[in-house]
Amino acid sequence: MPHVDTKAGFVRENFNKIANKYDRFNDWNSFLLHRIWKNRLVREIEGNLSDRLHVMDLCCGTGDISVRLGNSPRVDHITCVDFSENMLEIAKTRLKKQIEKGRVRFEIGDATELKNFQDFQFDAVSIGFGLRNVDDLSKAIREILRILKPGGLFLNLDVGKVKNPWIRWIADFYFFKIVPILGYILWGGKNEMFDYLPVSSLAYPNQENLKSILEKLGFQEVRYKNFVFGNAVLHIAKKPL
């Protein structure tokens, strides 16, 4: 990460650069499976909370999860937060209908400092493939816990760790060797962001460790669902009543 002082700064700078290619990149590198996983995230919200929900889509990127939340009859209002201005601009174009209905708010912000939001403000907070990019994981989780209402849910979809050594070898080869090449093809040349995306998984906690971190910081009833042998994982955590 040569050009900026922090991981968050690097990520913001480079997500702004690749914003208009990001959705296609996700389709390519996951064989469209990320769409199914995001649908599952929204179904978890619908199945575990009541109606007229106020949901924050944190690290919302281009609004992939936000669009799905907007289509849910259970969700009354969506707050989209990301520190990439270019990503947010794409999200705004995808959520035009929800903007016209007054159902969505956009905010440039950092997951570790949600100072524009009150305590106990949201019924649920979602993150899709963003938590591993924050500078301070624990600080971000504490902020999420703070803004959730008692009984509210935090749903985090991100990369996971595969236990089976043979499948892990195949997954690592694909993730570290093939995925950057897909990015270069899409970009039309080398871009350091497509090298960073696989590398970012190395320091990110595995499924059980993230579960333990969430519990230690105050969440309860923490569970997770593995996808594709654990290559991706959805954690669901509840704020105590």
Please report, for each region that a protein language model flagged, where it lies by residue.
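Core SAM-dependent methyltransferase catalytic element
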Residues: L217-L241
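Class I SAM-dependent methyltransferase SAM/SAH-binding core
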Residues: H54-L114
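A short SAM/SAH-binding and catalytic strip from SAM-dependent methyltransferases
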Residues: D123-L137
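Conserved alpha-helix/loop element of class I SAM-dependent methyltransferases that forms part
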Residues: F31-L53, R68
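C-terminal alpha-helical "lid/dimerization" subdomain adjacent to the S-adenosyl-L-methionine
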Residues: L157-I213, L217, R223
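N-terminal, positively charged/glycine-rich alpha-helical extensions of SAM-dependent methyltransferases
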Residues: M1-D23, L186
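A short acidic, Gly/Pro-enriched loop at the edge of an enzyme's catalytic core
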Residues: T112-V125
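A short glycine-rich, Lys/Arg-flanked "PGG" loop and its adjoining helix->strand segment in the class I
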Residues: S138-L153
